[in-house]
Structures are given as structure tokens and as C-alpha cells.
Amino acid sequence: MKIRPLHDRVIVRRMEEEKTSSGGIVIPDTAAEKPIRGEVVAVGNGKILESGEVRALDVKVGDKVLFGKYSGTDVKVESEELLVMREDDIMAVLEG
């Protein structure tokens, strides 16, 4: 099954964070916070403006992005955990 977001929605796959602290302490899964970085796996057609025009999204498939800790809605598609969020919930695109 494939998932296709509508309008200004974006599908993001979380990127795993480091499991060890800078001091070498292993962080157990129960204490680790949800990652706030991810990779865009699908984008909608664009945001519908008040004038009726459709503005293309700034992010594209493959972009690595930063988003808020509580952004988006968790969904499970074919046993894969994904996030559905609005483009406005994305704070930055990671480059390099």
C-alpha cells in the first residue's frame, strides 16, 4: 500500500538519533526522546491559497528535515512508522 498526502501535507520517516551520549553513556529506548529529524518520503500537490491558486511546497522527497517534538500524526503503513504533517510544521531543511 502506498500513501499519498493531500494539499500541503508531507509524509516523513523519522531518522534514528544516537543511542549513546557524548560521555559514552548508552541511552535505553525507554529514556530516549522521539527523534525530531526525518526524511521526506512523499509530498502533497501544494498549499491552496485564498485566491484559489496552488503554491508548490518548498520541501521535496529525499529532503532531511527538522520538525517540532510534537509535530504531525503518527501512522503505520505496512509495518513502517511514518509521520503525516503540514509543511508549516517543518522548521528547516538540513543541507550537506
Curated annotation (Swiss-Prot):
SMART domains: Cpn10
Source taxon at top rank: Bacteria
PANTHER family noted in UniProt: 10 KDA HEAT SHOCK PROTEIN, CO-CHAPERONIN GROES
Gene name linked to the record: groES
Localization per record: Cytoplasm
Keyword terms, alphabetized: Chaperone, Cytoplasm
Subunit-structure text: Heptamer of 7 subunits arranged in a ring. Interacts with the chaperonin GroEL.
Coiled-coil segments: none
InterPro entries hit by this protein: Chaperonin_GroES, Chaperonin_GroES_sf, Chaprnonin_Cpn10_CS, GroES-like_sf
GO cellular component, one term: cytoplasm
Annotated family: Belongs to the GroES chaperonin family.
GO molecular-function terms, A-Z: ATP binding; metal ion binding; protein folding chaperone; protein-folding chaperone binding; unfolded protein binding
Protein's name according to its UniProt entry: Co-chaperonin GroES
UniProt keyword Chaperone present: yes
CDD domains assigned: cpn10
Free-text function comment from the UniProt entry: Together with the chaperonin GroEL, plays an essential role in assisting protein folding. The GroEL-GroES system forms a nano-cage that allows encapsulation of the non-native substrate proteins and provides a physical environment optimized to promote and accelerate protein folding. GroES binds to the apical surface of the GroEL ring, thereby capping the opening of the GroEL channel.
A biological-process GO annotation: chaperone cofactor-dependent protein refolding
